[in-house]
């Protein structure tokens, strides 16, 4: 019994979660827009900007998305993005949100691929909140990550690529 409890305690310690926070700012550029009907609109746009996180990292990011609006509310938003850290390590993410106001909302992203050093982050899921003012985007992402993922992200600044 003591052995089982010890194993469970150690296992739980290894999966403890850390709140990884990322703040992103970017500029939106609309590529194509169609008024599908009187109340429905399709947009294709890109976002480009910078980011910082609560582990001391920083970098640049970009995203290409498609959006369907009905009465200025988000029906569907999907996109893919790339974040490049200060040491040129990178990750690709996919994101989505739906059924929210166009200028503000909450969604999810997931890491779908990454450079070699960041490959253990594939599958990491985060919640984001976004606000737009004019064509400027303000994002905050929150990810519950394991200590192993935190160690990888903390060591980015120490790695030279």
For the regions a protein language model found, what residue spans apply to each?
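Bacterial N-terminal signal peptides
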Residues: 2-11
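Beta-strand-enriched cores of mature, soluble protein domains
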Residues: 16-161
